[in-house]
Amino acid sequence: ILTELEKYFTVNFIDYKDIDKLSPDDFSIIFIATGGVERLVIQHFESLPRPAILLADGMQNSLAAALEISSWLRGRGMKSEILHGELPETIKRIFVLHSNFVAQRSLFGMRIGVMGTPSSWLVASNVDYLLAKRRWGIEYTDVSLDRIYEYYGQITDDEVGEALSLIHI
């Protein structure tokens, strides 16, 4: 499976002892080559990439090990996904996961202005600012509608036109 993946991706093997050398900007997949590695993965839980993407080729009991590891990780609130099955589907899924990873990393350090608050009957529409910062590195800032109206009243049509000319869609 790894030989086939190298036709589509740059594959760098990192020994589990060097997992702490990976940066948050490195897209990482954990290759479960054999059964019996469950304890090893659990021992390095804090260093694992999040979410944990587990690749199993079905050889040497690797799928059973990946299932066991995934179940253990999910039991501790960590998202995980197992890549296993037909190679073309696995390759497509890796492309999607990588694209999602790049998009998420591009949000890191961004600030998002929040205008207004959800209506009281919307019980699941509140944003957990602290969780968003921890998970994605995004900072939410409350912006009062009075401040928006103030800026709206000060802006000229020429300034709007100039700002719109800078937007490339």
PLM segments and residue spans:
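Short, charged N-terminal beta->alpha structural module
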Residues: I1-V11, L67
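Short beta-strand elements in bilobed, periplasmic/extracellular small-molecule ligand-binding domains
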Residues: Y8-Y16, S80-H84, I138-S144
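Cofactor- and metal-binding active-site motifs of prokaryotic enzymes
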Residues: I14-F108, P118-D128
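Domain-scale recognition of functional cores that engage charged ligands
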Residues: S119-R135, T141-D157, G161
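Conserved small/polar residues in nucleotide/adenosyl-binding loops
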Residues: I167-I169
